[in-house]
Swiss-Prot record:
One of its GO terms (cellular component) is DNA-directed RNA polymerase complex. The lineage of its organism: Bacteria, Pseudomonadati, Pseudomonadota, Gammaproteobacteria, Alteromonadales. It is an enzyme of class 2 (transferase). GO terms for biological process: DNA-templated transcription. The gene is rpoC. This is DNA-directed RNA polymerase subunit beta'.
Length: 1390
């Protein structure tokens, strides 16, 4: 019998498959799947509850209802397996076959498949070159279509109404054929000769000039080719046989009380069968045409509803007015098959409970309630009890566990030992949301969680719940221990910094114990070692904060990695000496010889990890936590109302501000300032007051004045509780203390605008009713925002994961020499991100040399770690070319060198790591911290935009970049280019500051001059845009008269100026200046509305002089989109509303003939055709007639469109743009994300390209294809010496990129399921199952992480299999083996 079971198991082995293909099913294929035709709409007999014969649940077709038992009960038991009962016709087999045996319905009249008809673009319509409207009229029996014109004047595919048809019949008789309904469409599709049509269209394409026609033909050609190549037949889009789903997948379940719950599909099938049978009868009876037609139409509608209810017309509803769920609804949406059952499954062996603090746990432990553990580990306990002989059977073991006998607890202890469990807190936003711990049994019902992992889980103990899962198999336990254990996840995968960081109480305790206090007990003592200091503290002879000397022996690794022991006497405090007792060997004492705030502790753990490795760090982190909790308790830091000290100058500050505001209000009433100016000024005043007040308050709080041992007055940091909490980073911030002890400040309305009356009171003084009302007004918006934000952030994460899920490290080095150039990010006078932060953990793309020499500092292909980064800083290197994911040459993944360091582990990344998902999670997880608001610029922000000079902060050399300039009459530099930047270089050649300088700015110093800090080096007028002369020229006026200009006289100086009127109102000519110079000849400059002319007609003007000034208003008051919506816009690659206009080619600017409301901009390159573009007149251009621009330069200001940047400046520029813009949003919120995560997403956005020219490939011009596929095809062609295809890389938004992925399974499970599947079926697509998602859906290990090697082995096996024939068992051999086994067994048991 054992052999028999072995044999059965062998037969049940799943096939290894490498791809899944989807296509159209031919009628023959549907019949081959089927086990019989369903002829009746009956389901089951309501008395016997047995399935009706030939009905929707028929046992003869679909299989028996009970295992190994036929319907009438003649054959029962296993011995009759395979017998077909002659009485009821049922095969004796497992009832499980009712899940996979299909039936079919022979349709009396063909029916169009609604997906290929209505899913846009309509495939049937494209095939026949008819509009959807026309085809629907034929299908739903409204008009005839000519299927065979014969010798008549009619055309094939022509539509005829009822009247026209009768007329044509009279005229031509039987010479032509016209039909209606799906039969007609079927005939038309049959007639198509694909090969011939394709050849004709390929010939016709090059001759077509009209763009729309070419697009249409290309579309049709692509569809025909995909049908031709995939072996699909167009006529299969019309169904003549309808498959019937196996009955157990659309069950009929008896409820109590004799009623039945049924799947909606049964109703839909019954409807189809009823109508089909009725149609058959009508056809047999030869009923009148109009009745038959109506019945056929109803059949078509019934099948439509079965396949996709509601796609056409009103959805068919059931008895309860709810639309029935059709086959299409089963698979799409959040509740569909993909997202509900395949990608998100429920798990057994899990429990959930509230969490509470476990301050005594070690980092790898969690407290598990006994009751919960008993339930979760039941099977293990049963097995152990039985093996021990404590229970004879499983049933007995069950009883023991239910009674909770004492032995059970001992067994539970053993079972749990070394068996990790997974803890998960929803929402799981990144991979640290699930970690493994060793359970420790505890009394009570709450799970105990180690405080240090709270940051990773984003958990707090205000009622959060967590789920526990038990890994069952030995492989799962191994992975949990080796990869998911909390001790292995010390660094955050998003930025490589420690995520196991103390917070709140622990920070406060450590901060308190490392502070120093003047005049503390025991000051000036000297201790022989930290232990003695601790003894003094314990015995009460020395205070924790006393400044003392301690002899410290430390062993620190030097440069060569040798451990040296040193003994020194160090000035420190008692508390720090005590803390040094838990400092691991090899860490320098300096690292704790300072007051430790949150930042310092984080740095301490980071340094420990880099110096000493994982094990020491974990133990140190635990010790830090215990110590921190202990001393937080000792400190007795608490908060009382007297700790909130209100600065005495508050009343005076507010009084003076109110006086200023009153003055502005008076000015407003006398009409000196506008309402807008008044609003901005008032808000400016209050913002300034708020800042001053909070500065006063903090300085008041943070310092105490004491008299030291020498009798002098000195200041020391305060021991005020509130200040200590904020200063240490434990809780609270200056902004919150300001509201408690300063003033509440300005409040926002729900629409984000600021209310101009501030709340001058603080919370200690208390608010009056009006103030309270103002503060609630904006606060409610905050709550509504949070809910919105969470949903939006979740959706962004989902889209990111979807686009990046199949990006996996799949080789060590792709060998590319390409990369990105990294420089420090400098904005104004501040280094926003230093070079070391940008290149740490990256692989060098080309040798780094010491600046100014040829000495190689770091060779290419070496990863920059902390030591090498220190080296770069020593030699003041400020530009490094590093490898990047974006430039990686790998076709279907990324190589380890282009990715660099695995941030969560600190070494170069392993093969098989799924970097795409990590990137998506790292960007999506902090999404909830971003704001949702679009900022309205006003007040302080508008003040910043009115900068009018550059004031440098440091000493150094001034350098100009991309500058075109002329020297004016004073010999100063006047800038005449757009994208000029000034940088300040220090004595080592490092860039320290970088400023943008506008057109028309005047420099006060020359290029390469030495400048001092606080020097003003450039000035300009912020309110107007000057037109500056390049050469000495004669200027004359043209079209300037009273109709379009007016003369204004300045009252103070008495000077008169000519100002252009508003040209958009009157139909005036546009005034021009004619400029005549030796260098350029005649040029004309047009003057827009409101321009002030600064010169007199007919005078000669020097270079650098200003001809005219164009006012700069209006463009500055745009809203800035910030926060989450901005990030989403960038990743969706959306075009901005009014994008900047960039120069398409390099050349000279001129203006052509104008049209109504548009200017014609012409750029003439040195050779080749000129380029023209129409630009709205109101757009302010940055260029003038005759100016040279280079390709990609900004012509009109505005937000730049990433598509333009890619097209005109290339891949690296667009990558830099998106990275910097995304980082700016996150930086504002203080979130650190490594650049390479954003680059990873950008790589996925750039994976498609448009074919410009097909070369010798099969690609059509204008086709969109994966870059990888084009590269592979081109490599093959180049090897054969043929012409490769030319292509242009496209930037795609993440949603579009996810839907355009090669894998149709992945795309279908993301969005627009119907469209994706229709498309894939028509193209006969194969899914190679490369990504993670597809493999999860088909239920395999994913090709990443530990599954990576499994898939590599599978591929290797497949290669072998192509050589060696696999051993298979034929049906005859199988039956023989079975009979032998059964006979042997029977004879043995006699």
């Amino acid at each position: 019998m054992k052999d028999l079971l072995k044999f059965l198991k062998q037969q049940n082995k799943t096939e290894e498959f490498d791809a899944i293909r989807i296509g159209l099913a031919s009628p023959d294929m549907v019949r081959s799947w089927s086990y019989g035709e369903v002829k009746k709409p009956e389901t089951i007999n309501y008395r016997t509850f047995k399935p009706e014969r030939d009905g929707l649940f028929c046992a003869r077709i679909f299989g028996p209802v009970k295992d190994y038992e036929c319907l009438c009960g003649k054959y029962k038991r296993l011995k009759h397996r395979g017998v077909i009962c002659e009485k009821c016709g049922v095969e004796v087999t497992l009832t499980k076959v009712r899940r996979d045996r299909m039936g079919h319905i022979d349709l009396a009249s063909p029916v169009a498949h609604i997906w290929f008809l209505k899913s846009l673009p309509s495939r049937i319509g494209l095939m026949l070159d008819m509009t959807l409207r026309d085809i629907e009229r034929v299908l739903y029996f409204e008009s005839f279509v000519v299927t065979e014109p014969g010798m008549t004047t009619l055309e094939r595919g022509q539509l005829l109404g009822e009247e026209e048809y009768l007329d044509a019949l009279e005229e031509h008789g039987d010479e032509f054929e016209a039909k209606m309904g799906a039969e007609a469409v079927l005939d038309l599709l049959r007639e198509l000769d694909l090969a011939q049509l394709i050849a004709e269209m390929r010939e016709e394409l090059p001759t077509i000039n009209s763009e729309t026609k070419r697009k249409k033909i290309t579309k049709r050609l692509k569809l025909m080719e995909s049908f031709h190549q995939s072996g699909n037949n167009p006529e299969w889009m019309i169904m003549t046989v309808l498959p019937v789903l196996p009955p157990d997948l659309r069950p009929l379940v008896p409820l109590d009380g004799g009623r039945f719950a049924t799947s909606d599909l049964n109703d839909l099938y019954r409807r189809v069968i009823n109508r089909n049978n009725r149609l058959k009868r009508l056809l047999d009876l030869a009923a009148p045409d109009i009745i038959v037609r109506n019945e056929k139409r109803m059949l078509q509608e019934a099948v439509d509803a079965l396949l996709d209810n509601g796609r056409r017309g009103r959805a068919i509803t059931g008895s309860n007015k709810r639309p029935l769920k059709s086959l299409a609804d089963m698979i799409k949406g959040k509740q569909g098959r993909f997202r509900q059952n395949l990608l998100g499954k429920r798990v057994d062996y899990s429990g959930r409970s509230v969490i509470t603090v476990g301050p005594t746990l070690k980092l790898h432990q969690c407290g598990l309630p006994k009751k919960m553990a008993l339930e979760l580990f039941k099977p293990f306990i049963y097995g152990k009890l039985e093996r021990r002989g404590m229970a004879t059977t499983i049933k007995a073991a069950k009883k023991m566990v239910e009674r909770e006998m004492p032995e059970v607890w001992d067994v539970l202890d053993e079972v749990i030992r070394e068996h990790p469990v997974l803890l998960n807190r929803a929402p799981t936003l990144h991979r640290l949301g699930i970690q493994a711990f060793e359970p420790v049994l505890i009394e009570g019902k709450a799970i105990h969680l180690h405080p240090l992992v709270c940051a990773a889980y984003n958990a707090d103990f205000d009622g959060d719940q967590m789920a526990v899962h038990v890994p069952l198999t030995i492989e799962a336990q191994l992975e949990a221990r080796a990869l998911m254990m909390s001790t292995n996840n010390i660094l955050s995968p998003a930025n490589g910094e420690p995520i196991i960081v103390p917070s709140q109480d622990v920070v406060l305790g450590l901060y308190y114990m490392t502070r120093d206090r003047i005049n503390a007990k025991g000051e000036g003592a000297i201790f022989k070692d930290p232990k003695e200091a601790e003894k003094a503290y314990r015995s009460g002879n020395a205070d924790l904060h006393a400044i003392v000397k301690v002899r410290i022996s430390q062993s620190v690794k030097n440069e060569n990695g040798v451990v040296e022991d040193t003994i020194t006497v160090i000035d420190t405090t008692v508390g720090r000496a005590i803390l040094s007792l838990i400092l691991p060997k090899g860490m320098p004492y300096e690292s704790i010889n300072q007051p430790l705030g949150k930042k310092q502790i984080s740095g301490l753990i980071n340094e420990c990890y880099r110096r000493l490795g994982l094990k020491d760090t974990v133990m140190f982190a635990d010790q830090i936590m215990y110590t921190g909790f202990h001393y937080a308790m000792k400190s007795g830091v608490s908060i009382g109302i007297d700790d909130l000290v209100i600065p005495p100058v508050k009343a005076q500050i507010i009084e003076s501000a109110e006086a200023e505001v009153t003055e502005i209000n008076q000015q407003f009433q006398s009409g000196l300032v506008t309402a807008g100016e008044k609003y901005n000024k008032v808000i400016d005043i209050w913002s300034r007051v708020n800042e001053n007040l909070s500065r006063e308050m903090m300085s008041n709080l943070s310092k105490d004045t004491v008299i030291n041992a020498q009798g002098e007055e000195v200041e020391q940091a305060s021991f005020n509780s509130v200040f200590m909490m904020a200063d240490s980073g434990a809780r609270g911030s200056a902004a919150q203390i300001r509201q408690l002890a300063g003033m509440r400040g300005l409040m926002a309305r729900p629409d984000g605008s600021i209310i101009e009356t501030p709340i001058t009171a603080n919370f200690r003084e208390g608010l009056n009713v009006l103030q309270y009302f103002i503060s609630t007004h904006g606060a409610r918006k905050g709550l509504a925002d949070t809910a919105l934000k969470t949903a939006n952030s979740g959706y962004l994460t989902r889209r990111l994961v979807d686009v990046a899920q199949d990006l996996v490290i799949n080789e060590d080095d792709c060998g590319t020499e390409d990369g990105l150039t990294m420089k420090p990010l400098i904005e104004g006078g501040d280094v926003v991100e230093a070079l070391r932060e940008r290149v740490l953990g990256r692989v060098v793309a080309e040798d780094i040399v010491i600046p100014g020499t040829n000495t190689v500092l770091v060779e290419r292909n070496i990863m920059l770690d902390e030591k090498l980064c220190d080296l770069l800083e020593e030699h003041s290197v400020d530009e490094v070319r590093v490898r990047s994911v974006i430039t990686c040459d790998n076709d279907f993944g990324v190589c380890a060198n282009c990715y660099g360091r695995d941030l969560a582990r600190g070494h170069i990344i392993n093969a098989g790591e799924s970097v795409g998902v990590i990137a998506a999670q790292s960007i999506g997880e902090p999404g909830t911290q971003l704001t949702m608001r679009t900022f309205h610029i006003g007040g302080a922000a508008s003040r910043a935009s009115a900068e009018n000079n550059v004031q440098v902060k440091t000493n150094g050399t001034l350098k100009l970049h991309n500058a075109k300039y002329v020297l004016n009459t004073d010999g100063k530099i006047a800038i005449i280019s757009r994208s000029t930047e000034i940088t300040i270089i220090d004595s080592y050649g490092r860039e320290k500051e970088r400023y943008k300088v506008p057109y028309g700015a005047v420099l006060t110093v020359q290029d390469n001059a030495e400048v001092q800090g606080n020097d003003i080096v450039a000035t300009w007028d912020p309110h107007s845009h000057p037109i500056v002369l390049e050469h000495k020229s004669k200027v004359s006026f043209s079209d300037i008269d009273d109709s379009n200009t007016e003369t204004q006289t300045d009252e103070l100086t008495g000077l008169t100026r000519i100002v252009v009127k508003d040209l958009s109102k009157a139909n005036a000519k546009e005034p021009k200046l004619i400029i005549e110079s030796e260098e350029r000849g005649l040029q004309e400059t047009r003057l827009p509305s409101f321009t002030t002319i600064e010169v007199v007609d007919g005078t000669t003007v020097n270079p650098g002089d200003v001809l005219a000034r164009i006012p700069q208003e209006g463009s500055k008051t745009r809203d800035i989109t910030g926060g989450l919506p901005r990030v989403a816009d960038l990743f969706e690659a959306r075009k901005p509303k009014e994008p900047a206009i960039l120069a398409e080619v390099t050349g000279t600017i001129s203006f052509g003939k104008e049209t109504k409301g548009k200017k014609r901009l012409v750029i003439t390159p040195d050779e080749g055709d000129h380029y023209e573009e129409m630009i709205p007149k109101w757009r302010q251009l940055n260029v003038f007639e005759g100016e040279r621009v280079s390709k990609g330069e900004v012509i009109a200001d505005g937000p730049e469109s990433p598509h333009d940047i890619l097209r005109l400046r290339g891949v690296t520029h667009v990558a830099n743009y998106i990275v910097n813009e995304v980082q700016e949003v996150y930086r504002l919120q203080g979130v650190k994300i490594n650049d390479k995560h954003i680059e990873t997403i950008i790589r996925q956005m750039l994976r498609k390209c448009t074919i410009m020219h097909g070369g010798d490939t099969d690609f059509l011009a204008g086709e969109q294809i994966e870059v990888a596929r084009v590269n592979i095809a081109n490599r093959d062609l180049e090897a054969q010496g043929k012409i490769p295809a030319k292509f242009e890389i496209q930037l795609m938004g993440i949603t579009k990129a996810s839907l355009a992925t090669e894998s149709f399974i992945s795309a279908a499970s993301f969005q627009e399921t119907t469209r994706v599947l229709t498309d894939a079926a028509v193209n006969g697509k194969s899914d190679e199952l490369r990504g993670l998602k597809e493999n999860v859906i088909v239920g395999r290990l994913i090709p990443a992480g530990t599954g990576f090697s499994y898939h590599q082995e599978r591929m290797a096996r497949r290669k072998q299999r192509n050589v060696v024939e696999e051993q298979t068992v034929s049906a005859e051999e199988a039956t023989q083996a079975l009979t032998d086994a059964l006979n042997a067994d029977l004879s043995g048991n006699q």
